[in-house]
Every structure is written in C-alpha cells, then in structure tokens.
Amino acid sequence: MADDEVIRKRLLIDGEGVGDDRRITTLMKTFVKWCNSTDDDNDASYQKLLAQLAQCEFAMGKTEMVHAMNERETENYEKAYKEVEQSITHAYEEIATCKTNLQEAKRIRRNKQEYDALAKEITKHPERQETTRQISELEKDLNSLTETKESLVSKLELRKKQFYLLINTIHELQRMIDDEKTDEGTALSPQQSITSPGKVALMDT
C-alpha cells in the first residue's frame, strides 16, 4: 500500500490533469497551423504536432493509471470492510453466548446462596460424619462454580471491549472509502469531459 501511495504522488505531480485543457488547445492550434503550413514548414509543424499528441496520450495514460490504482484501493477497502463485518457478526455471536453463560452463572450464584443457607442450618445440629463430608463436597463444588462464573464475567467484558473496537474500525474504514470515492470523482470528471472532443476532432481530419 505504501508503494501505491508513492506512485500516485508521482502520477499526480501535474495537478491531476489540470494542464490537459491547455495541451489540447495547443494541439488544435498546432494542427490548424500544420494544415495551413507551406511545404517548407510542413515537416517541422508535423513533428511538433506528433510531439504534442504524444504528450496528450501520455497524460491520458497517466490518468488511466491513477483511476486503475484507485479502483484497486477501493477493492482493498471493500474487502477489509467485509472482513470487519464478519468479525462483528462473530463478536455478536460470542456476546450472545457470554450473556447466556452469565445468566447461568447468576443461577449458580442463587443456588450457592441457597446452599450456604442450608449449610448454616445444618451446622446448627449435632455434627455427623456424613453430613460434614457432604458439606465439604458442596463447598468444593460451589468454589468451582464461583471460579467459573468469574471467568465468564471476565470473558464477557473482554468481548464487549473487542466489539466496541470493531465498531470504531468499521466507521473509520467507511469514512476512508467515502473520501477516496469523492477524490476520484473530482479528479476524473474534468478529464473525461475534455478528452472526448479532442479525439473526435482528430478522427474527423
């Protein structure tokens, strides 16, 4: 992409075709002069006419190269735009999954609170070996569920941050595409309206 930028700057050094109108006007004057020239001046006028025609053809080719380069850049932007859209869709899916997991974590938390209340009630009664073992197992399960819930919450927060970043990226990319198309339209419209009459005039002779 950096190489294309360098090429474009070199191609646009003429001012994006601003001098084409002057070239065509000069070419037409030279053509008329050649048509009215004497035999002595005929060859010199003809060579000058060919040189000016070559300059016009070069300017047209340069504009076509700029247009092709802009088309490639637009295609690259559109491709990147689609990739970002896919990433956003994937992020939405992951966020939906995380929300589901978060609801499950909340349910686990409610169960934990119920288990804690039950454990407190059990501890009020004389301890028994089996009851103590069950409570110990419940505590292990609850600790594991708590860790799972905390992990899910952290993952959800991370996905939210990634989603916001993707949204900002797509907005910036869209702005770049719009600016590129606007610049291209401004550069090409004058060129097309000037070149066509010149071509018709040459073909008629």
From Swiss-Prot:
UniProt keyword Flavoprotein present: no
Pfam families tied to this protein: THOC7
The keyword NAD belongs to this UniProt entry's keyword annotation: no
Residue ranges that the Swiss-Prot or TrEMBL entry lists as coiled coil: 68-158
GO biological process: mRNA export from nucleus; mRNA processing
Family the entry assigns: Belongs to the THOC7 family.
Protein name per Swiss-Prot or TrEMBL: THO complex subunit 7 homolog
Natural source organism: Nematostella vectensis (Starlet sea anemone)
Organism lineage string: Eukaryota, Metazoa, Cnidaria, Anthozoa, Hexacorallia
Protein's gene: thoc7
